[in-house]
Regions:
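N-terminal catalytic scaffold of extracellular/periplasmic and nuclease hydrolases
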Residues: 1-148, 153-177, 181
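Beta-strand elements within well-structured catalytic alpha/beta cores of enzymes
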Residues: 1-8, 89, 186, 227-234, ...
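Generic, well-ordered alpha-helical scaffold segments in large soluble proteins
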Residues: 92, 216-220, 258-265
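Phosphate/oxyanion-binding active-site loops and adjacent basic polyanion-contact surfaces
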Residues: 118, 206-214, 251-255
C-alpha cells in the first residue's frame, strides 16, 4: 500500500486531531491512525524547478523516484519519460490498483500511469490507461470526459473498447466487476468533477468513502497474486485550497479511515504486507 494525502502536512493532521479531541470532550489526546505508527520521516518537497511543488511534480517524485518540473506528469527534469513503481511491480507479476478521492486523471494518480508535459491534458492522460494494463482504477470519474476538439469518443467508452469494465457506484461495481479482468470504478454522482463539492456540502448515499473504495479494491484484486494499491486523499488539498477547514478535516478523517482498512489487512497478513 502507498497512501498519499495530497497537500497534507503536519498542520492538517494537528487540526484534525484537535477537532477529534474537542468532539470527544477532551483538551487533546485523540490521534489519527497515521499518527500511531512507530516511525516518522520528513522530506523536502520542492520540485525540480520551483520552491513550492505541485501535485504532478510531487506525484512524479513519489511514483518514479525523481524530482520533476511543476506541471509535468511522469517526466523528469530532462524531459525524459520515467517509469513508476506501479509499472515496475506490474512487470514483476503484481496486480495494480490506482485510486483517489478526486478524478482518476488528476495529477497524483496520473503520475503512476501516464506521461504528459501538461497535467491539464486530462483527456490525453486518461487515454493512456489501457496502455498501462493496470487492473483497477477508482475515483471520482474523469475531468474532460471528451477531448478539447470534441471529435473523439468519451473516456468511458474508450476504456470499455479497450478492455475495461467501467462502473458507476458501489452496487454497479459489485455486479459488473465479477469475472472482469480490468475495471474502473467511478463515483455514482461524479461530484468531484468540480472543486466546489465536498463532504460537508452534502454527500449522496451512493458515493463511496475512501475506505469503501479500498475495500472494493481489495475484494477485486484478491489474494491469489501480490498486489500494489496507491490511494490518494486528493480532496484534502482541494478543500485546503478553498480554505474550507471543516471539509479538509472531514477528508483527512476519510483518508485515515482508509489507512485503517489497510492496517487491518496488514494485521491479518503480516508476512505478505
Amino acid at each position: 500500500f502507498l497512501f498519499i494525502g495530497d497537500g497534507m502536512g503536519a498542520t492538517h493532521v494537528a487540526v484534525t486531531e484537535s477537532y477529534l479531541s474537542h468532539k470527544a470532550g477532551k483538551l487533546g489526546g485523540e490521534q489519527l491512525q497515521i499518527s500511531q505508527f512507530p516511525y516518522y520521516g520528513t522530506a523536502t518537497t520542492h520540485s525540480a524547478n520551483r520552491h513550492i511543488t505541485c501535485s504532478s511534480a510531487a506525484g512524479t517524485a513519489i511514483a518514479c523516484g525523481e524530482k520533476a518540473n511543476n506541471g509535468t506528469v511522469g517526466i523528469n527534469k530532462d524531459s525524459v519519460e520515467i517509469e513508476s513503481v506501479a509499472y515496475a511491480l506490474k512487470k514483476d507479476g503484481y496486480r495494480i490498483g490506482i485510486m483517489s478521492t478526486v478524478p482518476i486523471n488528476h495529477a497524483t494518480p496520473a503520475s503512476f500511469y501516464a506521461h504528459s508535459f501538461n497535467r491539464g491534458n486530462y483527456y490525453e492522460i486518461s487515454s493512456q490507461i489501457p496502455a498501462s494494463g493496470f487492473d483497477l482504477f477508482a475515483g471520482a470519474g474523469f475531468l474532460d470526459h471528451k477531448d478539447k476538439a470534441g471529435d473523439k469518443e468519451a473516456t468511458d467508452a474508450y476504456l470499455e473498447k479497450n478492455g475495461y469494465v467501467v462502473s458507476y457506484g458501489i452496487e454497479e461495481f459489485k455486479a459488473e466487476s465479477e469475472g472482469a479482468e480490468k475495471v474502473v470504478f467511478c463515483q455514482a454522482s461524479n461530484r468531484n468533477e468540480s472543486a466546489d463539492n465536498y463532504v460537508s456540502d452534502g454527500v449522496e448515499e451512493e458515493d463511496a468513502t475512501m475506505a469503501q473504495m479500498l475495500e472494493l479494491a481489495l475484494d477485486f484484486l484478491g489474494d491469489e497474486q501480490p498486489f500494489f494499491i496507491m490511494g490518494e486523499g486528493g480532496a484534502i488539498d482541494w478543500a485546503a485550497h478553498d480554505n474550507r477547514t471543516m471539509s479538509m478535516v472531514e477528508n483527512v478523517i476519510d483518508f485515515d479511515n482508509a489507512v485503517k482498512v489497510a492496517y487491518k489487512f496488514y494485521l491479518e497478513h503480516p508476512d505478505e504486507t
